[in-house]
């Protein structure tokens, strides 16, 4: 593919590399951009997306490239263009142009990388991070003698790291947790495009149409404004399936449509969820539950302030949701006791959100090392154990806030989860049955932590019940 200079000026990437070095010390670093992923044979590839750590420090999507350096001295190693690349792929910027735009001293052929590694003290002295793409991971294994297999990631922990790679991971996390002005500008731009997409999806929704028509309307806005989906869009009347990959069903009057769709602009992600009635009007039970989830969203957002532990933000959403379920007669008991026991997780089984940045779940390739602060580990309790983030919030961190209510058969029919609450009368199934038309509701915003009140970056995307209904029925 053709390689183009970054949107930002070189000073952005020079400053980021300096911050990384200040956090790391004078260790040499090598980061891989990664290779395209084939769909079904080598020449037919998915759209290329560079590894986020490389993208953060260079702003450039360059297949197969490697960034190598320390201090203020950095080089990129890449495969020279083939003679016929311009014919098939179009002309790329010259290497001199790219070097100046990225702020590196030189761009050299990839064949010279091995000698450059020796010049930096050898593979053992270099710090690197595991590549995501299999070909790049194989290169790392050969060049750096790292014991990283292709399938050794755990659900939460990613690849185990030793020094000096562990030090690089901690340094990278420290500089990427809070966003600079350039990053925030791109996130805002992505959210503006997401706003257009959600409005287009709402406007197209009506009984008889298919979910995929709404998805197409949303993603058309992404494409029309120079963005791509940041992840696989979820557009489904089966809102109880948390990460539903299918959008083939016809929508019917009485359905709720859950839409979790965000644009990615210049590599930076947005992540927004709205839920709306297909007919343009909530039923009484749908409206009651929608307002409970909305209040949980609002209350949790208000907690996004410097120094607040994100786990406490999650628990605030849980308390608000539980209070609403008690008010509706679905649960019985003391609010705090119910939350401590995890009764709310029967209906809200995931965490309230995650970091947002270049990755929609930012830095999740580094596992809980990124998401959890020092000394913090995941809970073993159902629901709370799925919390992706447990750090103290700081200025210019961007997080999602996404409480929900779901009627998941696999949970509600599981005696190991529901049994204790059934036996002591906490769970009132007869009352719950009245809410059968509420399969799933999620309301998700992207929120910046500031020195004062939280900034809801996605505030323009309608979420009040009447505003949502007005957009669907317009």
Where are the regions that the model predicts?
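Active-site neighborhoods and metal-handling regions in enzymes and metal-associated proteins
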Residues: 1-474
